[in-house]
Amino acid sequence: MDVTIQHPWFKRALGPFYPSRLFDQFFGEGLFEYDLLPFLSSTISPYYRQSLFRTVLDSGISELMTHMWFVMHQPHAGNPKNNPGKVRSDRDKFVIFLDVKHFSPEDLTVKVLEDFVEIHGKHNERQDDHGYISREFHRRYRLPSNVDQSALSCSLSADGMLTFSGPKVQSGLDAGHSERAIPVSREEKPSSAPSS
């Protein structure tokens, strides 16, 4: 019995515009700009591709695509905007660990609003290794209902780890829900926060 092997449906739908090869098989040389536009590259002879696409893409699109690639692939671990922190809630304690190494205690504001803790950090423009930078972030976490809000504390370790903690009360006792600011104290030793 003969079985006909057909191309996948998405290849047939694009017809001649879909390339039949994978990046011209130049695996060790990286991508050319025309490899990112396969529907155009398959209709143009390889002899003309390099100069044609180089002319078109030298108009600024290449720089934009390169910038977008670097933004998508840069690490964001130290940025609180992209680092939600670690939250631990066990039987007798609630703790939040947040990496804020670019901020001093004066740059941080920690508030408790009903059942939420809000952590806001902002520093004005300052110089670093690459030029001038200003940073700002805002994080909001829900507090468990049995956290004693009158005993909440917040500290910033020498390595820039903010630790917000509060004990949990036994069920049936008042947890003291109200709005108040929590001062951020500085510790001289590095944090004992869990690593990722």
Curated annotation (Swiss-Prot):
Source organism, top-level taxon: Eukaryota
Stretches with biased composition (Basic and acidic residues): 176-190
Span of the signal peptide: none
PTM-bearing positions, type Deamidated glutamine: Q6, Q50, Q170
Localization, UniProt: Cytoplasm; Nucleus
Positions of glycan attachment: S185
Amino acids binding Zn(2+) 3: H177
Gene Ontology cellular component list: cytoplasm; nucleus; protein-containing complex
Membrane-crossing residue ranges in chain numbering: none
MF terms in GO: identical protein binding; metal ion binding; structural constituent of eye lens; structural molecule activity; unfolded protein binding
Biological process terms in GO annotation: actin filament organization; apoptotic process; apoptotic process involved in morphogenesis; camera-type eye development; embryonic camera-type eye morphogenesis; lens development in camera-type eye; lens fiber cell morphogenesis; lens morphogenesis in camera-type eye
Stated family: Belongs to the small heat shock protein (HSP20) family.
Family matches, as PANTHER family: ALPHA-CRYSTALLIN A CHAIN (PTHR45640:SF14), HEAT SHOCK PROTEIN HSP-12.2-RELATED (PTHR45640)
Function: Contributes to the transparency and refractive index of the lens. Acts as a chaperone, preventing aggregation of various proteins under a wide range of stress conditions. Required for the correct formation of lens intermediate filaments as part of a complex composed of BFSP1, BFSP2 and CRYAA.
Miscellaneous note of the record: Lenses of streptozotocin-induced diabetic rats show increased levels of C-terminal truncated forms.
Protein name (record): Alpha-crystallin A chain
Source organism per UniProt: Rattus norvegicus
Gene, per the UniProt record: Cryaa
